[in-house]
Curated annotation (Swiss-Prot):
Lineage, opening ranks: Bacteria, Pseudomonadati, Bacteroidota, Bacteroidia, Bacteroidales
MF GO annotations: adenylylsulfate kinase activity; ATP binding
InterPro entries per record: APS_kinase, P-loop_NTPase
Species name: Bacteroides fragilis (strain ATCC 25285 / DSM 2151 / CCUG 4856 / JCM 11019 / LMG 10263 / NCTC 9343 / Onslow / VPI 2553 / EN-2)
UniProt record similarity statement: Belongs to the APS kinase family.
Gene3D superfamilies for this protein: P-loop containing nucleotide triphosphate hydrolases (3.40.50.300)
Enzyme class: transferase
PANTHER family referenced in this protein's UniProt entry, alphabetically: BIFUNCTIONAL 3'-PHOSPHOADENOSINE 5'-PHOSPHOSULFATE SYNTHASE (PTHR11055), PAPS SYNTHETASE, ISOFORM D (PTHR11055:SF1)
Protein name per UniProt: Adenylyl-sulfate kinase
Database matches in Pfam families: APS_kinase
Catalytic function, reaction form: adenosine 5'-phosphosulfate + ATP = 3'-phosphoadenylyl sulfate + ADP + H(+)
Length: 202
C-alpha cells in the first residue's frame, strides 16, 4: 500500500471553490471601488449589493467601518499600516471569493502599487477595479464628515487629495463620476459588467 506522506490530509477532503459556486449558483469575484473620500464609493457599493441581492446573489461588503473596527483595529494610518490594511483586506476577500461570494470592497486605496498588490493576492482574473472618479471639488463640497475642512486647516495630516496624493487607476474596468451620473445610472453600468462575471452557465 502506498504511504500517504501528506501531513495535512484534511486538505484532500476539503470542498473546492467550484463545489461552493455550484451550491450558490454564482461565481465569486472581487469588485474593488477606489476613489477619494466622499466620491460615492460606499453609497454605490451598498446600492450594488441590494441590486445583486434582489437577483438572488450572495455578496459581502468590506469597508472602513467593518474592517478598521474589527480585524484591522490594531492598525494606524502610517504608510506601513496603510499597506498592511489593504493586504489583510485582500487576503480576507480571497477567502470570501474562494467560497463563491461576490465581495465588494470600498477603500480609498490611493495608489497603483497598493491596488496592484490587492489584485495579485486576490488573483487578477477575479479582480474588477472600479474607479469612482468624482472630482476633488465635488468631494470637498459634499464633505459630510467635515474631513476636508479639517485637512485644509491642517488638523488631519496626510489626507488623500489635500496633503497626500491620489493616483488614478491606469486601466480600471469602469470609471464612474458621481457628479455626472446618478446612483441608478452608476449601478446600471456596474451591473452590465458584473452580472456576466458572476453568472454560472450550466
Amino acid at each position: 500500500m502506498e504511504e500517504n506522506n501528506n501531513i495535512y490530509p484534511i486538505f484532500d477532503r476539503m470542498l473546492t471553490r467550484q463545489d461552493k459556486e455550484e451550491l450558490l449558483k454564482q461565481r465569486g469575484v472581487m469588485i474593488w471601488f477606489t476613489g477619494l473620500s466622499g466620491s460615492g464609493k460606499s453609497t454605490i457599493a451598498i446600492a450594488l449589493e441590494r441590486e445583486l441581492h434582489k437577483r438572488g446573489l450572495l455578496c459581502r461588503i468590506l469597508d472602513g467601518d467593518n474592517i478598521r473596527t474589527g480585524i484591522n483595529n490594531n492598525l494606524g494610518f502610517s504608510e506601513t499600516d496603510r499597506v498592511e490594511n489593504i493586504r489583510r483586506i485582500a487576503e480576507v476577500s480571497k477567502l470570501f471569493i474562494d467560497t463563491g461570494i461576490i465581495t465588494i470592497a470600498a477603500f480609498i486605496s490611493p495608489n497603483n502599487d497598493i491596488r496592484e498588490m490587492a489584485a495579485r493576492i486576490v488573483g487578477p482574473d477575479d479582480f474588477l477595479e472600479i474607479f469612482v472618479s468624482t472630482p476633488l471639488a465635488e468631494c470637498e463640497k459634499r464633505d459630510v464628515k467635515g474631513l476636508y475642512a479639517k485637512a485644509r486647516r491642517g488638523e488631519i495630516k496626510n489626507f488623500t487629495g489635500i496633503s497626500a496624493p491620489f493616483e488614478a487607476p491606469e486601466h480600471p474596468a469602469l470609471s464612474l463620476d458621481t457628479s455626472v451620473l446618478s446612483l441608478e445610472e452608476s449601478v446600471n453600468r456596474l451591473l452590465e459588467i458584473v452580472l456576466p462575471r458572476v453568472s454560472r452557465h450550466e
